[in-house]
UniProtKB/Swiss-Prot annotation:
The gene is fusA. This is Elongation factor G. It comes from Brucella melitensis biotype 1 (strain ATCC 23456 / CCUG 17765 / NCTC 10094 / 16M). Keywords: Cytoplasm, Elongation factor, GTP-binding, Nucleotide-binding, Protein biosynthesis. GO terms for molecular function: GTP binding; GTPase activity; guanosine tetraphosphate binding; translation elongation factor activity. Residues 8-287 form the tr-type G domain. One of its GO terms (cellular component) is cytoplasm.
Length: 694
């Protein structure tokens, strides 16, 4: 089976938006107009094709990025292949957004015409800047009360610090919004609002003629700056033709010099088709963006993979989902080469082989089996054993690791327990499945209490995972209050000489160990044996190490795991009959418990690196508030029109921060935080914690 669409005719793009900007409705409309969907699902009544997890339909927010393939015939009569990646719009899911931005070539940023640029839009826009993603802006909901296209355009400049390039103007607003002026063709496009109706092309309304001329003039001035020859011609009085103008806008958009702005209302079916034409005309094909960089596994040097079927195969796994019919699905973007069913590939991150069994092309709620896929494709692979999000799969003869995605450490933990015995086993399976899908979610069990602890990126993040457990895996669970992950360590050296003896008829137990416990700079545990002359036989030494390691998980103060301890076995004694590995294990365990007390145990707390991005007006409040949370401000800097405040703050003081920040800045500031290091807890605080956990 040969390639059906040339790679130049692919558009891999996503739609990024604030939580209520109408993204799901827009995606639905796109799927309808591109012929994949016969009945439109409205988020208003909770039935939409792209949001395919129940909670999303209930909460009306998009959580998982589903990838969809569809087709559109452009203005030139040629069909293009669209791969649309749906991205979530809630701040606790920004990890999903980052993940999908990695595999996109371009994006449409949706704005709500009434609200303009909202806080979440700023966050996602910044993430897209980081990956240098070409973007267009669609000002949606033009039919809403208070819709203001011109204010939204102004906010793209003032709030996002980006260059806005309107290529359309709205005709009317709110209830009177009927269509748009196309500033390239200088025609009016109007719609009667019936679903799927084509636009009526007519003359620009007389009362808008001057405004249209003024905006077209601005459009041309910005566009010709992209190209020297066009600039010279323009200065000599030669205007670019409409096709030349489109080519200039395309070039500037792909180079992220400016962002074309369109408008309409997806819900009322006005402005959708011109947006699809703009995707073809302005957003990049895989061949228009720089080749993806990676590390050559054999030489450890940087290498690239061109978007071509002839290049060695390389692909990135960017999402894992559980499908009720197919089981685990790994969504991958093929950057180079050609993938055939049945081949065996190398997972270079894990150093394991994977065989490609079933390959699926996904529509948001249906799927088709395929036998091969090409550079630029986004495919779902069923039944991969080793691959997790962010892994590279490639040709075993030309191994490469495409840039690793970096996932922040979870910052919040809660204890979770099954309601009934029957739920116990199901809960284990459910949590492991969810952790495989989402690298920012971790599961562990607390040795002391035997409780299962789940950790994630925020309170909403964990809420939704617990909810999914209930629905998808039918597990009922009780959830505790959020907790901080404390640690313990020692502050000075201590030497312990401990003898373990037990005699009760038959063979007894005997072991004596002399160990020095001391602090060291790392977080790990170091064990060293300095036994000479066989006072402890070689075969018993691993027992000493194992004994100490087995109790490192619960420190003497409040039962938290120990960090940064070095143990040196310097002497000991054994008995020919009564000594055993087990006896030495028991002796070293007791020696450690005694040693940790003597070596000045102390409590450590996680310190978070907090970055707050806030409008100038709220900087004072933000800094004052961080100081009151035992925070240390490490600096402030200007970023575009906002100010970035960097600080180190104990996690224990960051619970509920999202709400305080929201009210402090009227929802305009955002923050990110990730774990940085552990630090001793101040004495007063430490005593409270010990009381609580004693």
């Amino acid at each position: 089976m040969a390639r059906e669409y040339k790679i130049e005719d692919y558009r891999n793009f996503g739609i990024m938006a604030h939580i209520d900007a109408g993204k799901t409705t827009m995606t639905e409309r796109i799927l309808f107009y591109t012929g994949k969907n016969h009945k439109i699902g409205e988020t208003h009544d909770g039935a939409s094709t792209m949001d395919w997890m129940e909670q999303e339909q209930e909460r009306g927010i998009t959580i998982t990025s589903a990838a969809t393939t569809t087709f559109w015939q452009g203005r030139d009569g040629k069909k293009r292949r669209f791969n649309i990646i749906d991205t979530p719009g809630h701040v606790d899911f920004t990890i999903e957004v980052e993940r999908s931005l990695r595999v996109l070539d371009g994006a449409i940023a949706l704005l709500d015409a009434n609200a303009g640029v909202e806080p979440q839009t700023e966050t996602v826009w910044r993430q897209a800047e980081k990956y240098h993603v070409p973007r267009m802006v669609f000002v949606n909901k033009m039919d809403k009360i208070g819709a203001d296209f011109y204010r939204s355009v102004e906010m793209v400049g003032s709030r996002l610090g980006a260059v806005a390039l309107p290529v359309q103007l709205p005709i009317g607003a709110e209830n009177d919004f009927v269509g748009v002026v196309d500033l390239i063709e200088m025609k009016a496009l109007t719609w009667d609002g019936t679903i799927g109706a084509p636009a009526t092309v007519g003359e620009i309304p007389a009362d808008m003629a001057d405004k249209a001329e003024e905006y077209r003039e601005k459009l041309i001035e910005l566009a010709v700056e992209i190209d020297e020859a066009a600039m010279e011609a323009y200065l000599e009085g030669t205007m670019p033709t409409n096709d030349e103008l489109r080519a200039l806008i395309r070039k500037g958009t792909i180079e992220v010099k400016f962002h074309p702005i369109l408008c309409g209302t997806a819900f009322k079916n006005r402005g959708v088709q011109p947006l699809l034409d703009a995707v073809v005309e302005f957003l990049p094909a895989p061949t228009d963006v720089p080749a993806i960089k990676g590390i050559d596994v054999k030489t450890e040097t940087e290498t690239t993979r061109e978007s071509s079927d002839e290049a060695p195969l390389s692909m990135l796994a960017f999402k894992i989902m559980n499908d009720p019919f197919v089981g685990s699905l790994t969504f991958t973007r093929i950057y180079s080469g050609k993938l055939t069913k049945g081949v065996s590939l190398e997972n270079t991150v894990k150093g394991k082989r994977e065989r490609i069994g079933r390959m699926l092309q996904m529509h948001s709620n249906s799927r088709e089996d395929i036998d091969e896929a090409f550079a630029g494709d986004i495919v779902a692979l069923a039944g991969l054993k080793e691959t997790t999000t962010g892994d590279t799969l490639c040709d075993p003869l030309k191994p490469v690791i495409l840039e690793r995605m970096e996932f922040p450490d979870p910052v919040i933990e809660i204890a979770i327990e099954p309601k009934t015995k029957a739920d116990q086993e199901k809960m284990g399976i459910a949590l492991n499945r969810l952790a495989a899908e989402d690298p920012s979610f971790r599961v562990k069990s607390d040795e002391e209490s035997g409780q299962t602890i789940i950790a994630g990126m925020g309170e909403l993040h964990l809420d939704i995972l617990v909810d999914r457990m209930k629905r998808e895996f039918k597990v009922e669970a009780n959830v505790g209050a959020p907790q901080v992950a404390y640690r313990e360590s020692i502050t000075r050296a201590a030497e312990i000489d401990y003898t373990h003896k037990k005699q009760s008829g038959g063979s007894g137990q005997f072991a004596r160990v002399k160990i020095i416990f001391e602090p060291h700079d790392g977080d790990d545990f170091i064990f060293e044996s300095k036994i000479v002359g066989g006072s402890v036989p070689k075969e018993y030494i691993p027992g000493v190490q194992k004994g100490i390691e087995s109790v490192m998980g619960a420190g003497p103060l409040a039962g938290f795991p120990m960090l940064g301890v070095k143990a040196t076995l310097i002497d000991g004694a054994y008995h020919d009959v009564d000594s055993s590995v087990l006896a030495f294990e028991i002796a070293s365990r007791a020696a450690f418990r005694e040693g940790a007390q003597k070596a000045g145990a102390q409590l450590l707390e996680p310190i978070m690196k907090v970055e707050v991005v806030t409008p100038e007006d709220y900087v004072g409040d933000v800094i004052g508030d961080l100081n009151s949370r035992r925070g240390q401000i490490s600096g402030t800097e200007a970023r575009g029109i906002a100010t970035v405040v960097n600080a180190m703050v104990p996690l224990a003081n960051m619970f509920g921060y999202v709400n305080s920040l929201r009210s402090m800045s009227q929802g305009r500031a955002q923050y990110t935080m990730q774990f940085d290091h552990y630090e001793p807890v101040p004495t007063a605080v430490a005593q409270e914690i010990q009381k609580k956990f004693a």
